[in-house]
Swiss-Prot record:
The gene is mocC. This is Rhizopine catabolism protein MocC. It holds the Pfam family AP_endonuc_2. Involved in rhizopine (L-3-O-methyl-scyllo-inosamine) catabolism. The lineage of its organism: Bacteria, Pseudomonadati, Pseudomonadota, Alphaproteobacteria, Hyphomicrobiales. It comes from the Bacteria. PANTHER family: HYDROXYPYRUVATE ISOMERASE, INOSOSE DEHYDRATASE. Belongs to the IolE/MocC family.
Amino acid sequence: MKAEDPPFGRNSLMSIKIAINPITWTNDDVPELGGDTPLEQCLSEMRQAGYAGTELGGKYPRQSAALKRVLDLYGLELASGWWDGRLYERDVDAEFEAILPHLTLLRDLGARHVVYADTSMGRHDGIRQPISKRPRLRGEEWEAYGRKLTDLAERMAEFGVGLAFHHHMGTIVETDEEVDRLMSVTGERVGLLFDSGHSAFSGGDPVALCVRHAKRIVHVHCKDVRGDVLRAAREGDLSFMDAVLEGIFTVPGDGGVDFPSILENLAKTGYRGWLVVEAEQDPNQAHPLTYAKMGHENLARMAAAAGFRLSSADAFDWIDTRQNV
């Protein structure tokens, strides 16, 4: 099956699955945030909280058989995995060769899309600089970049993994307007990873962005935003990471993002991908299992109210019967 086939079938019952990113427990960008938390604890607590899947994190095995064994042990599927793209700085052939091992891992584990963020011109610097200092594409660069990204997405689709482009603070595609521009200069094989929190943090309107690009959305990151921290971050020109440490993000239903409207729009337009709770916080301040449970409970309730039906995996009450794992 090729990556352009709908993730769970546009004409099937409105059944979706909920996953979580391990960033709730451990932040790969900031080792002091959960760096000593073992992978086994992350996965066990994901399942205890009710999740059907996980995205990749830095502690996960990168060999297909080993990763499958550990995910099977906890009854989890692989929803996707982040890739630090460099397409702005590379040609398509070089970028595809660089990402191929990652795509292979995702395909082997059944993930339908890769989380692709273009971190050219220094994402890791960008997320630590004031938000006003992040990299930008010049006006004349958009068309050429769109052609390159479309070519890359077509190569990925032929391989069997779709491209889900992640708009992200501190990168060349950050704001709602830049997402609009990107969608206008790329072909349909370029799917959109819709991230409610990054839209809000950038000064956008997550509901309106979701409505405008619903037919291109193939993967969803569900993060909420604390309004007081958002205002302080934008007024004070904080860096992305400083805002995270101040608590800008939280799980769905615990902030100011209008998730009922977002989910209703996704249901209306036939979305069948994953809903991923991906809300980085300081685990010393926001107890991971507590927030994981809160996020799943809130998102499941709001998704059901919007017309989605949770898969049996999310409804399953998992009991950890392992010994000394």
